[in-house]
């Protein structure tokens, strides 16, 4: 059975991708803390998911990104700040707010796969979902979620990794909308109750942020109950 590394945030997409991969491969769930607000809750969810589907976890922290974010904050004022539980101002990071962050995350995934002897890196990105949810309309989804982004990154990997031990980048959900991904996950008995997709680090879904709203719409469109959101009420 071949090995694979799944970049996992603990959210729906990456969990569905992991469950699907675990049917035929040994899976390593990779969680990366790059300074995102929900990092602690995400990591806890990833560990719970790993235990449920029978795979191991790899945790990596990127403290240098917090330092970079502080430089950005000083240059642009308080708009990029939030107050943590100690009322101290800390950088608020997202994949969208840090240039080239997705490329860095993918690079870490590739490096991890090489060290683990894994043949592939899997990410649950969905261009279809990004396009559907873009406030600017069709054709204006996030560039780092587009299929051609991963195609170009794959070419870079091919040029950088030994041909004797290639590592392939897989995006199995790239063409599926969020509700379609929920339906796929349901067919594979995905432990949705363990997933976490919220902008906060509360450990339970706040129900009001944009990630919670997108999750709610997806389950409604799929005509399925969301066990994680139900538990948070």
Segments predicted by a language model, with ranges:
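ATP-dependent adenylation/nucleotidyltransferase module used to activate substrates
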Residues: 1-189
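Local cysteine-cluster metal-coordination motifs and their immediate loop/turn environment
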Residues: 103, 107, 196-217
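Structured loop/turn residues at beta-strand edges in well-structured enzyme cores
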Residues: 116, 193, 207
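Short, intrinsically disordered, charge-biased short linear motifs at domain edges
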Residues: 184-187, 192-202
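A polyampholytic, Gly/Pro-enriched intrinsically disordered region
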Residues: 190, 216-221
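Short cysteine/histidine-rich metal-coordination sites, predominantly Zn2+-binding motifs
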Residues: 201-202, 222-233
């Amino acid at each position: 059975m071949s090995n694979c590394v799944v970049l996992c945030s603990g959210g729906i997409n990456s969990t569905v991708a992991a469950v699907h991969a675990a049917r035929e491969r040994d899976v390593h769930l990779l969680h990366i803390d790059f300074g995102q607000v929900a990092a602690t809750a995400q990591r806890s969810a990833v560990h719970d998911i790993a235990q449920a589907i029978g795979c191991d976890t790899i945790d990596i922290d990127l403290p240098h990104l917090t330092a970079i974010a502080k430089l950005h904050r000083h240059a642009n004022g308080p708009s990029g700040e939030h107050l943590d539980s100690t009322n101290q101002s800390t950088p608020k990071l997202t994949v969208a707010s840090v240039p080239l962050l997705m490329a860095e995350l993918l690079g870490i995934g590739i490096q991890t796969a090489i060290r683990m002897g894994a043949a592939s890196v899997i990410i649950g990105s969905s261009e279809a979902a990004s396009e559907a949810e873009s406030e600017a309309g069709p054709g204006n989804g996030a560039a780092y979620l587009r299929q051609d982004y991963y195609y170009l990154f794959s070419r870079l990997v091919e040029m950088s990794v030994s041909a004797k031990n290639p590592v392939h980048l897989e995006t199995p959900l790239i063409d599926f909308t969020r509700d379609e991904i929920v339906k796929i996950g349901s067919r594979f008995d995905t432990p949705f109750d363990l997933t976490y997709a919220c902008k906060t680090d509360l450990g339970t879904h706040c129900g009001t942020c944009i990630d919670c709203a997108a999750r709610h719409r997806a389950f409604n469109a799929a005509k399925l109950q969301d066990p994680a959101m139900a538990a948070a009420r």
